[in-house]
């Protein structure tokens, strides 16, 4: 009975279309207050009536690829209970070595591979030719 009530509350908060999409991609329909949205489009929610550890969650901007590496460090600390303050409540901290947050490129063309790796043969040949041309110019 409580599940039916919970689904009804979720549908009332989101609407039927969004509820069906969320239920399809996540397998769960939760409701709570929207706490924030990051620059990637991830939406962060909190519901203090849920049990501890399940009362904070994220809905990814891209429904089809739920990639946890798209969560920026500011919201990572909030969602994992390192900090109870939201990024909007914290003082901005930007060290000199900080780079923009990117998702983990493993399994894509942007992934790191060592120079003598089997699939880098063409890349290494091109780099060697460029180095030889630069050496000949000097």
Swiss-Prot record:
Keyword set includes Lyase: no
Keyword terms: Electron transport, Membrane, Mitochondrion, Mitochondrion inner membrane, Respiratory chain, Transport
Region Disordered, annotated ranges: 97-116
Organism superkingdom: Eukaryota
Membrane topology per record: Peripheral membrane protein
Compartment(s): Mitochondrion inner membrane
Entry GO CC: mitochondrial inner membrane; mitochondrion; respiratory chain complex I
Transport found in the keyword field: yes
InterPro entries: NDUFA12
Family according to the record: Belongs to the complex I NDUFA12 subunit family.
Described purpose of this protein according to its UniProt entry: Accessory subunit of the mitochondrial membrane respiratory chain NADH dehydrogenase (Complex I), that is believed not to be involved in catalysis. Complex I functions in the transfer of electrons from NADH to the respiratory chain. The immediate electron acceptor for the enzyme is believed to be ubiquinone.
Description of how the protein assembles with itself and partners: Complex I is composed of 45 different subunits.
Designated name of the protein: NADH dehydrogenase [ubiquinone] 1 alpha subcomplex subunit 12
């Amino acid at each position: 009975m409580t599940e039916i009530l919970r689904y009804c509350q979720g549908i009332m908060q989101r609407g039927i279309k969004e509820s069906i999409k969320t239920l399809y991609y996540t397998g769960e329909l939760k409701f709570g207050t929207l706490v924030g949205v990051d620059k990637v489009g991830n939406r962060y929610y909190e519901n203090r009536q849920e049990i501890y550890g399940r009362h904070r969650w994220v809905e990814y901007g891209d429904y089809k690829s739920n990639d946890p590496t798209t969560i920026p460090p500011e919201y990572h600390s909030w969602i994992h209970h390192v900090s109870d303050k939201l990024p909007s409540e914290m003082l901005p901290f930007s060290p000199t070595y900080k780079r923009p947050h990117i998702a983990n490129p493993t399994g894509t063309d942007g992934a790191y591979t060592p120079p003598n790796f089997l699939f880098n043969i063409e890349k290494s040949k091109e780099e060697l030719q460029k180095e030889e041309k630069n050496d000949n110019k000097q």
